[in-house]
Each structure stands twice: as C-alpha cells, then as structure tokens.
Amino acid sequence: MLHYYYGTKERLFHEVFEAKLQLMGHALLQAFMKSHLPFMQRIEEGLRSHFDFLAANPGLPGFLLHEISAADSERMNRVRQPMFCLMQTVVGHLQPEVDELVRKGEIAPITCEDLIIDMVSLNVFYFVAGSLIDPFFVADPPQRAAFLERRKEENVRVIRQRLKL
C-alpha cells in the first residue's frame, strides 16, 4: 500500500521529513517573528514551541540522526537544505536584534547561531537519550508528562541565564 502511494522508501522518507519540518518551522517562525513581543518572550516561546513539537514527535530526533548518519550525500543534502533555509530565516530575523541588545548591554554577548545551537541541544537531548534517562528519573508513564514539563521550563531557565548579564 505504501509503495502504491509513495513509490519508494526514499520518497516516503522525504514526504514525512518535509511534513514534520514544515510543522516545526511554522511553530518556530510563529514564535520568533512576533516582533511586537519583547525579545526574551519570543525566545522563551520559541524554545517551548520547539520542545512541545519534539514531545509530540519524540522519535523524530533519533530518526533524523540515524538517517543522516546512514544517508548518502544526496539524502544528506535533501535533509540539510530545508533545515538550513529555516535556520537562515530565523538567524536573519533575530541576529540584528541580538546585536543591538548586546550593544546596549541588555543581554550577554552571543551569536544567533550559538543561541540556536544551545536551544536545540537542550531540547533535543532528552528525546535522543530518553531511553538512558528514563530508568533513573522517570519511574512510570504518568510521571513522564510532569518530567517533560519540568525539563521544558528548566531549558527556558538555562537559556534565560545564558543571556543574562
């Protein structure tokens, strides 16, 4: 049945990847592009939005890491290009504001690239290493929702601290 709709496993991968990237991109851009909101509020909303996206798609980070590490260069480029475009949009929008806030002494010196890497690293880690973490910190499934909420808010706190002077 899948073969009928998609033709190849590669086409199925590409369709799923693009759909998920669009969802994540929309959520991130919606948060980061709200120019009427203060910078920190947009960063916090973007961080929470990204975390919520990952919580709704917990297998996606591991899947992408596996696919990228096992992929040929053509697949790598097809995965990398839309992600690169999304990051360039976010960086292009935020970097001038970050530079201005750093110049005014309102936030600690940082580039958008470093800020995004910090945010993504904090959010993605649990979803990549959850099977190693859960036995020590998450006793049963009902605790998982509370644990994820705590992790999300801790990630926000860490980024807030990182930007504080």
Predicted features, each with a name:
Residues 15, 30-62, 90-91, 112-119, ...:
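Hydrophobic alpha-helical connector segments
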Residues 25-29, 41, 73-103, 114, ...:
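Amphipathic alpha-helical packing segments from all-alpha helical-bundle domains
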Residues 49-52, 56, 88-108, 122-165:
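C-terminal peripheral helix-coil segments that are non-catalytic and often amphipathic
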